[in-house]
């Protein structure tokens, strides 16, 4: 968060220093309609479950509003603020993973407590996440000639969650129960307590627990091309370094219980699969993206 504060102070400091020197004839405004396409994996994540991995694709579609507050001999400084919708598709994979926990009487058709064992084979989840993002950034631009210029961007991006759902679940799990009170009797018959092999696509599943607010540092470089007197096109590459986590970690390193296990069972609800985002200790969206924009200057 200190990095965010320093960048914001720099942005406003530069504007304050130069605004007094601006010439009214050099004031220029811009409206920028843009689309960003994520390149490669867009999420950096960690989990205490070593076999849990994630990858994400992201995009962004929005409008930015720019104000050129200083220009001289082809150089310019521009302050920008925007609003965009930024969807993300996050895929989580839990590879071969075994665990057990103490199952209560509510997890047995005969009301017995026992030790429940799971052997998971490649549990896959896809999470759909939507955010409204507000980029605030400073642009330094240099116009090389009458129709072509280069620029660099530096700023921050704030994100606000709009929706988060698990849109897809697949995989298999084998489960069985051991009953210590019956001389460690092992039961894996499917007619009792959903033991045996289960297709997880048919199980119930939870909802990702997200942070409502996220921040990232924005940097970028690009080129702007003039189409007409007021209209231009921009192609740039941007990198957003996530500062805050997208998801709230719910379980961290403790032994599994009926409440915290990735898959659990009760007689009333059947097999229930938790969102794998519950087990992410770090989940920062950090996309490298290609940005294409249409710019109207006036």
Name what the model sees in each region.
Residues 1-28:
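Cleavable N-terminal export/targeting peptides
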Residues 17, 128-139:
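Short, proline-centered helix/strand-breaking motifs
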Residues 22-70, 210, 284-291, 295-298:
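Short glycine/proline- and aromatic-enriched beta-strand/turn motifs that initiate or cap beta-hairpins
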Residues 25-33, 73-79, 130-132, 146-152, ...:
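Outer-envelope beta-barrel architecture signal
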Residues 33-37, 61-69, 83-85, 134-140, ...:
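Residues on the lipid-exposed face of transmembrane beta-strands in outer-membrane beta-barrel proteins
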Residues 40-56, 88-130, 161-214, 246-289:
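Extracellular/periplasm-exposed beta-strand and loop segments of Gram-negative cell-envelope proteins
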Residues 117-121, 134-136, 142:
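Short acidic (Asp/Glu) patches
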Residues 215, 222-224, 231-252:
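Extended, basic/helix-rich recognition subdomains
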């Amino acid at each position: 968060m200190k990095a965010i504060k320093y960048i914001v102070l720099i942005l406003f400091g530069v504007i304050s220093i130069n605004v007094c020197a601006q010439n009214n004839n050099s004031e220029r405004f811009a409206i920028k309609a843009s689309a960003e396409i994520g390149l490669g994996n867009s999420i950096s994540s960690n989990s205490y479950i070593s076999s849990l991995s994630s990858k994400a694709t992201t995009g962004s579609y929005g409008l930015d509003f720019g104000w050129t507050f200083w220009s001289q001999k082809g150089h310019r400084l521009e302050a920008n603020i925007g609003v965009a919708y930024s969807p993300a598709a996050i895929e989580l994979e839990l590879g071969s993973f075994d665990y057990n926990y103490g199952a209560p009487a509510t997890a047995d058709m005969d009301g017995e407590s026992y030790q429940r064992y799971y052997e998971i084979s490649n549990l896959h989840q896809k999470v759909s996440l939507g955010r409204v993002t507000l980029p605030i950034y400073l642009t330094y631009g240099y116009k090389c000639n009458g129709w072509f210029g280069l620029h660099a961007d530096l700023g921050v991006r704030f994100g606000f969650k709009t929706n988060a759902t698990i849109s897809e679940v697949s995989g298999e799990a084998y489960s069985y129960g051991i009953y210590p009170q019956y001389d460690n009797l092992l039961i894996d018959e499917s007619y009792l307590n959903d033991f045996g092999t289960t297709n997880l696509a048919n199980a119930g599943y939870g909802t990702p627990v997200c942070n409502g607010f996220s921040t990232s540092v924005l940097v970028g470089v690009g080129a702007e091309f003039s189409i007409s007197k007021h209209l231009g096109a921009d192609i740039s590459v941007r990198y957003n370094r996530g500062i805050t986590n997208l998801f709230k970690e719910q379980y961290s390193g403790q032994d599994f219980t009926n409440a915290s296990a990735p898959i659990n069972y009760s007689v009333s609800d059947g097999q229930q699969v938790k969102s794998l985002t519950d087990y992410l200790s770090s989940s920062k969206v950090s996309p490298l993206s290609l940005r294409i924009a249409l710019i109207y200057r006036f």
